[in-house]
């Protein structure tokens, strides 16, 4: 398996990417970490599509050979994983490598769930309470049902938040957006964290972890971090 450590995972919080490698190794894979490469997410979210296409074209030259060899590409940051699964096909539709890479891209939960249950080497989460904040891109593009089913198969009790955390990448950091960002977080995320102070806060998205840390003083963990047995 190829672990695609996106720009967020390489520069802002590498815990999730390292844990993805550990979990894959424990489950019989020989993970390779992809060379440095950006998918252009920040260009996409700010409407700079010409720049985004250049970054994606460069990324394809790195990832396509692995995909062509049948090696799954495992994403770490949900928003970047969603770029490969969805935006890539819209931005570079005439490049045959786009469909190849998009089809090979998986979430960690998808890779693990494809293994027979008897071959999964994962910790018991019996009795563990989890408040899960699916990243909006994860929820809308890849879906989060596979993640929830995997967690529940390990014994976890999962409270799944349906709304946005409110940070939404750079949105909540931009001038004039702070109050709205906090209001969105106050709709679901913050009251649920307050009601379940002992629960593990599970959030694959860097934005979702940042929002909870800054507004509630609550640390969050990536799915891989939880499965690797880390405390976060």
Where are these regions (language model features)?
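Iron-sulfur cluster-binding electron-transfer modules in prokaryotic oxidoreductases
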Residues: 1-232
């Amino acid at each position: 398996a190829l672990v695609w450590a996106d720009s967020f995972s390489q520069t802002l919080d590498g815990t999730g990417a390292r844990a993805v490698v550990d979990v894959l190794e424990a489950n019989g894979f020989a993970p390779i970490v992809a060379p440095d490469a950006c998918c252009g997410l920040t260009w996409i979210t700010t409407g700079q599509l010409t720049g985004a296409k250049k970054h994606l074209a460069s990324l394809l030259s790195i990832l396509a050979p692995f995909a062509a060899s049948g090696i799954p590409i495992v994403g770490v940051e949900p928003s970047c994983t969603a770029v490969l699964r969805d935006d890539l096909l819209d931005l570079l539709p005439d490049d045959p490598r786009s469909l190849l890479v998009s089809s090979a891209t998986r979430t960690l939960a998808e890779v693990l769930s494809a293994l027979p249950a008897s071959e999964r080497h994962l910790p018991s989460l019996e009795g563990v309470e989890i408040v899960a904040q699916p990243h909006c891109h994860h929820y809308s593009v890849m879906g989060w049902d596979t993640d929830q089913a995997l967690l529940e198969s390990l014994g976890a009790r999962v409270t799944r938040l349906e709304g946005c955390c409110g940070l939404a990448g750079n949105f909540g950091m931009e001038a004039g957006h702070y109050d709205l960002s906090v209001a969105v977080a106050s709709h679901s995320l913050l009251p649920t964290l307050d009601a379940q102070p002992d629960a593990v806060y599970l959030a694959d998205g860097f934005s979702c972890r940042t929002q909870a840390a800054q507004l509630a003083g609550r640390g969050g963990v990536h799915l891989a971090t939880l499965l690797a047995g880390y405390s976060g």
